[in-house]
Structures are given as structure tokens and as C-alpha cells.
Amino acid sequence: MNTSPLTVLSVPHDALNFAMPAEACDCHTHVFGPSANYPLSSERNYMPGDALVPDLLALHDGLQIARVVIVHPSPYGTDNACTLDALRLLGPRGRGVAVIDAHTTDAELQAMHKVGVRGIRLNLETSGIHNSDYAATQLRWATARVAPLGWHLQMFTNLSVMASLREVINTLDTPVVFDHFCLARAELGTSQPHFDTLLALLASGRVWLKLSAPHRVAQDPDGAAMTEMARTLIAHRPDRLLWGSDWPHPGGRPGQPRHRDQVEAFNPINDGHALNRLAAWVDDAATLRQILATNPARLYDF
């Protein structure tokens, strides 16, 4: 158990108050920069600062996290160079989730696979896309592209769109992963519209859910509402749950406008505290090991 103080990118992180399972994995992180090396997309909706592989390794080594998944961030569009170079630096401890489009070739997908990519992300929420027909079309297209590689589809979307895709998902052999609690709002409780569909899809074994970035879905990530929602999910299907920090925590600040041409500060999230909160939600060493180590090993082919 680590008791040393840890500060990364000027953000302090609490020491762990539980025994971290061996081969634990942070299933949702991003790497940005160096900014001089990787051009941003002209269609980005924010400008990130640098958050480099050495910073990520300092965080994970300090928190005893042995494995990591780099999710390609939206400001780079479909230019995956920054993420792929990060995977090359990480070696066998890293896996990746890319963002592609119709111009991405099969040869490029094969090359991504060799450096550790195991899925692609559909960033619907980032682009403000809530059209169910469009989402279904994208899901079918993406499945056709990645199924031959054995990859999964990761979707950033909300409960309503997720529910509209239920029939499509039930026809797929490709695993579907929803990140950030599928944007279920903690304060609306477990009876909120479409939460029952999320539970049903988890029960079917066709989808996975990331218990990531609770600050995105709760006014108080430590509060009773967030705890109730998380524990409901954990009790329901722990073998389909993953944990991710969302480091370095992009996403803007509530009430503050976003600027494409001005560096946006990352949210100062305490990831040690987030892990301790997860351990308190679970309160069972075997289930915690399943969420932090066993499940990621299966999904990401570690």
C-alpha cells in the first residue's frame, strides 16, 4: 500500500487505502502532445495542454496501476498519431482505442492492432449527436470495420441514445462499451428513464460499462446518489464493468465557455481519491479485482 505523497501536473493524489490488485488497469486515459509534434483537428471544440506519457506513468506508478488504455482524444480528430506513439512508448502495459473514419484503410487498422489498439470510439456526445438513426448507422458501419480484428466499439453517448440502439446491439457479435456511466445522472436515481435498459443490456452480456469520470454525471461524486447508482451497477453485473480515471480530465468546467484557440485547463481531479471511492463502492476484494484487473484483461487482450 503506497503512502508516499504524489503530485502529477500540479494535481495532488491521495495515497491508496486498500490493497491494489496485481495487473490493475486504468481503462480510460488520454495523452496530449507534445503540442509541437501533433497538430490538432480544425474541427476540435477545445484546445488541450500537454499531458505526456511520462506524466501518465508517474501517476500510475504512484497508484500501483500496472496497465493502461489510451483512448484517442477528440481534438486530434481521426489522426491517431499521438495515441499510437504513446502506445509504442508504453509497450505491453498499454492498449488503445482509436477514432477512425471512412478514409481509414484496413492496412492502417492492422498497423494499429500491432501496437495495441483493440477498439474504436464513436464520439457522439462530443459532437452533440443524439440522432438515433445516425447512431445506428455508425454502429453497423463500425462493426463491419473492426469485427475481423476482434475489436470492440466504445461509445460516448447518453442513456436515451443507448436505449434506441438496443435492438441493433442485440444483433452484433462485436462487444459495445459505454463510457462515463453512459451519462446516467446520479441525482435522477436508478429509476431514471432508460436506466433499466442499461441494466438489461449489461445482463445480456453484450455490453460493458466504464465506471469512469463520476464528476461528469454527479453534482457530488462522493454523495449518496452517486454511491447508490454505482453500487446498483456493481451488484448487477460486475463482470461487465471497468474502471477508468479519465486522466488528465479534459471536458471543461461547468458554466465556463469552451474555446478552440485557447488552452483549456484540465480538471484537477484527485485520482487516488477516485480509486479509494471505487474500493468503498465495491467493498469486496474479489469483485474489486474483477473490475480493476480481470475484466480489462479479457476485453483488451492483455
Task: Place the predicted regions along the sequence by residue.
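Hydrophobic faces of well-ordered beta-strands that scaffold small-molecule active sites
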Residues: 24-29, 68-71, 94-98, 120-122, ...
